[in-house]
UniProtKB/Swiss-Prot annotation:
Its main location: membrane. It is an enzyme of class 7 (translocase). Belongs to the ABC transporter superfamily. Spermidine/putrescine importer (TC 3.A.1.11.1) family. It is found in: Cell membrane. This is Spermidine/putrescine import ATP-binding protein PotA. Keywords: ATP-binding, Cell membrane, Membrane, Nucleotide-binding, Translocase, Transport. ATP binds at G38, P39, S40, G41, C42, G43, K44, T45. Part of the ABC transporter complex PotABCD involved in spermidine/putrescine import. Responsible for energy coupling to the transport system. It comes from Levilactobacillus brevis (strain ATCC 367 / BCRC 12310 / CIP 105137 / JCM 1170 / LMG 11437 / NCIMB 947 / NCTC 947). The complex is composed of two ATP-binding proteins (PotA), two transmembrane proteins (PotB and PotC) and a solute-binding protein (PotD). One of its GO terms (molecular function) is ATP hydrolysis activity. CDD domains: ABC_PotA_N. GO terms for cellular component: ATP-binding cassette (ABC) transporter complex.
Length: 370
């Protein structure tokens, strides 16, 4: 682990009796792309504002490179923020907007010109310095807002839902550009979004939030494949979440049947929830089925069919298949043991991580495909 650049220790934020953040612990390393992901009102922007110095923490410590900065004013912190509305000045040219912070610092004109030109080159708008803000597209304005932030040479760049105002095609393009920019700059990005696709596509690490708490942190693959609870599983991508019961290590029951799984360390007969991603289900004939479902409806999504079905116990199923099915037909489903993920009710992240460590690697031996 490299030297942390930002640390939050037991940070709480309250307004009267309303708790916005509850005992937030968070560590950001230098040179990585992090995302705070959660629904509106979960506290993710408050974390951003607390790090930036725009909002004071009620309790807890905020550290920058190991030093407490709770009392350091926003303009003295080596972080910059890109806001959702970009906050560009319409009466200034592009270059004047980018130079604004340097001008306030009374930097020499030659230095300002050099750094502005460098920042515009980094966001691929080198020839736009003399243009008016009103002449720019939404994507160009967003890049100018980023240039205005990085021209200050921050060690941390905070981005508060900067892609939310863009159309779907441009938003996807900007995901590539932001990730590429972060890697070229080599600084820490902390990105705020409610869009799961953005978080999964760009991040080195994701913090999933709800109701003022960080529920789970980890790589996009870890968060997607090993959600800690119902909220995370449902919020990150599409899921089939079913009630079940743990039979033994690597054995779980749901849907009226018992199946081999990749989870262990859970007491026998404990009620659990099982997650199966729609893309991990395969349609098959009834003779080879692990479960039988009745097709309700389907939608063609371009590269796959999204099929809604119901099993004999009334559980709803969502299946992604390259092959179509007929409405009303009974059809079989099959899946691999490692495609089942078992979730315990009320399990905290530390408990979840400790349980996984006790049997980590054993499931790979059990399900090694040779």
């Amino acid at each position: 682990m490299t030297q942390p650049i930002i640390e939050l220790h037991q940070v709480t934020k309250r307004y009267a009796d309303n708790t916005i953040l509850s005992n937030i612990n968070l560590t950001l390393e230098s040179g990585k792309f992090y995302t705070l992901l959660g629904p509106s009102g979960c506290g993710k922007t408050t974390i951003l504002r607390t790090i930036a110095g725009f909002t004071d923490a009620t309790t807890g410590d905020i550290l920058f490179a190991g030093k407490r900065i709770n009392d350091v004013p926003a303009n003295k912190r080596n972080v910059n923020t890109v806001f959702q509305d970009y906050a560009l000045f319409p009466h200034m040219t592009v270059a004047e907007n980018v130079a604004f912070g340097l001008t306030l610092q009374k930097r020499p004109k030659s230095e300002i010109a050099e750094r502005v030109n460098q920042a515009l080159r980094l966001v691929q708008l080198a020839d736009y310095g003399d243009r008016a803000i009103s002449a720019l597209s939404g994507g160009q304005q967003q890049r100018i807002a980023i240039a205005r932030a990085i021209v200050m040479q921050p060690q941390v760049l905070l981005l508060d839902e900067p892609l939310s105002a863009l159309d779907a095609k441009l938003r996807r393009q900007m995901q590539y550009e932001l990730r590429d920019l972060q890697q070229r700059l080599g600084i820490t990005f902390l990105f705020v979004t409610h869009d799961q696709e953005e978080a999964l596509a760009m991040s080195d690490e994701i913090f999933v939030m709800n109701q003022g708490e960080i529920l789970q942190s980890g790589s996009p693959v870890d968060i997607y494949d090993e959600p800690i609870n119902h909220f995370v599983a449902d919020f990150i991508g599409e899921s089939n979440i079913l009630p079940g019961k743990m039979i033994d290590d690597f054995q779980v029951a749901f849907g009226g049947h018992q199946f081999e799984c990749a989870d262990a360390g859970i007491p026998v007969n404990e009620p659990v929830e099982i997650v199966i991603r729609p893309e991990d289900l395969t349609l098959t004939d009834l003779a080879h089925a692990k479960l039988t479902v009745t097709i309700n409806t389907q939608l063609f999504r371009g590269d796959y069919y999204e099929i809604a079905a119901t099993d004999g116990l009334g559980n709803d199923w969502l299946i992604h298949s390259v092959n179509p099915a007929e409405d009303g037909d009974q059809i079989g489903l099959t899946f691999r043991p490692q495609d089942l993920h078992v979730m315990r009710f009320g399990e905290k992240e530390a408990e979840f991580d400790a349980r996984l460590e006790t049997y980590e690697g054993t499931e790979d031996d059990r399900f090694d495909e040779t």
